[in-house]
Amino acid sequence: MQKTTALPLAILLAATTLTACSNGENNHTDNLKIFATTGYLADAAANLAPEADITTMVGPGGDPHTYQPTTHDIEAMKDADLVLWNGLHLEAQMVDQLESLGEKQLAVGDQLDEQDLLPWPEQGKGGEQLYDPHIWNSPKLWSQAVESIGDKLGDIDSEHAADYSTAADNYESQIAAAQDKAEKELATAKPRVLITGHDAFNYFGKTFDFDIHATDFVTTEATKSATEISELADTIADKKVPVIFKDNQANPQAVTSLQQAVESRGWKVTVSDEELFADTLGPDAPTDTYLGAFEHNAHTVAKALS
């Protein structure tokens, strides 16, 4: 999607809402309209409300950290019955605008217990503690996010609240089964060090006992310094890590530079042929769903470190 450089989102949202009201328009249909900032959230919504009309803001390969909404996004948010966003500063460019949507928005990460979240090295504008927003890589936290989505759907559409609750329970059972399968696959992986292109896998590391390092930090536009790359190359060579995992958002130049730095230290490290899925899902099945992407990531790591 193209980036917009027009009026601020909050102003445009207010303007389009006033226009709709003044014209007496009613854009609602029998199906709920759900706007989701990420594919992970859109997939959760589809599992809980399969009849809903769902719009995904950031598609495959996009970066929700830096994404700026288009006019089409603004219209879709205005028309939606429910706007789902990750929160925890993932959608860093549009936090105020999303919060301005009032009761019809839900930041799923903000519903979680801070004690379960991993700290983030950066601070907020007011100096407040930030937390790692990549919660979908923790099956436990993502199940809690699914639960909160089910509750919100029940609030919006109380007639079908029991259906949403049942669907959430069923989906959470599938997530738990995927975690069990991943634990078995990853049990013998060695060394327990995961080198990725994008800094999105810390919850994966916490869940499955991996030490996580990334060539990019926070966003696809924020690369590590030469000193940090050198230190990471030392770690890879010292621990004899056999593979660097590229992902669908990584900076390939950073991955190549790291590989060369490792080889200069006398250790040969390969770059995985199979990419991991970081902030977005894949364009095709099976990685176009949360479960598909999660299982793919676990299997790819297990195979490469077997």
Enumerate the predicted regions with their spans.
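Extracytoplasmic metal-acquisition and chelation regions
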Residues: 3-9, 20-306
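Bacterial Sec-type N-terminal signal peptides, specifically the leucine/valine-rich hydrophobic h-region
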Residues: 15-18
